[in-house]
């Protein structure tokens, strides 16, 4: 019984030396660049040669990726909105999230997955909207096909998600493929899980043709679901993420706890336990929860007890403008008055210790 555990602990120092400190995906910083392809490609720090090649060759795709960064970071912040770490970004950091993702935690796993998914979504959408020279609608969706409802014709514009996945794999994975360390393998696994998540929610939409909508003829196409579907799915995967260690030959993972199942390609994996994110810690990249708004009546992660880590909270009375006395007017409008509403806002207290922040 002791041998397997001993093997894990003896391998831990080696594992930690394999966890590269340079893990931030520098392409995330593309959200802050301008429209000039050469300026964008040459000034985003940390891109590897393959990424710069793709950047120079496909400036229109890079613009789509850059616009998509705002979308997937917003989705990350939505999913973590009630948690101590709320996916906050740092505008001046080329890694976008600061040092917090240097730890191979489940938060890192989620961010790599959602960012990879965001690239697939942004590129695929741009293809369908005719914004990219290198792709368009899915060329394979032509002719006649069958489903459970009968025969239909492929028509409209099916989202070319295979192109989005192919380009995302080539661009996003390029940096990790240059490394042989454990963290690179972790990132590659979670990147793939993110890409697969987008395709999971590809759905068939159809339009009926015929007298009075009789649907004697159908035209169908494939369309991506709203990105929130992908975000919700990856959030569930985050909550069920599997802690792993490297196998002995350094080519893959094995579960850290033998009682848990082996991770599938759809699961998120991580190496290190997360910090509690209670205290601001510059070294760990944790902003802490001092000043965060908490919910006094909640029993969840956003409750004042959990969010404030037992430090207590301050309450302030604020007023806000709301719509009130709304009435329906025929036809067809709803008209409301603007009213001032007073409410209590609860924010987490800072730690009492004078040295709660790491000195600069």
UniProtKB/Swiss-Prot annotation:
GO terms for cellular component: extracellular space. Gene3D superfamilies: 3.30.2460.20. GO terms for biological process: animal organ development; canonical Wnt signaling pathway; cell fate commitment; neuron differentiation. It is found in: Secreted, Extracellular space, Extracellular matrix. Pfam families: wnt (PF00110). Residues 1-25 form the signal peptide. InterPro entries: Wnt, Wnt2, Wnt_C, Wnt_CS. Its main location: secreted. Palmitoleoylation is required for efficient binding to frizzled receptors. Depalmitoleoylation leads to Wnt signaling pathway inhibition. GO terms for molecular function: cytokine activity; frizzled binding. Glycans are attached at residue 295. Keywords: Developmental protein, Disulfide bond, Extracellular matrix, Glycoprotein, Lipoprotein, Secreted, Signal, Wnt signaling pathway. A lipid is attached at residue 212 (O-palmitoleoyl serine). Disulfide bonds join 76-87, 127-135, 137-157, 206-220, 208-215, 278-309, 294-304, 308-348, 324-339, 326-336, 331-332. Belongs to the Wnt family. Ligand for members of the frizzled family of seven transmembrane receptors. Probable developmental protein. May be a signaling molecule which affects the development of discrete regions of tissues. Is likely to signal over only few cell diameters. This is Protein Wnt-2. It comes from Oryctolagus cuniculus (Rabbit). The lineage of its organism: Eukaryota, Metazoa, Chordata, Craniata, Vertebrata. The gene is WNT2.
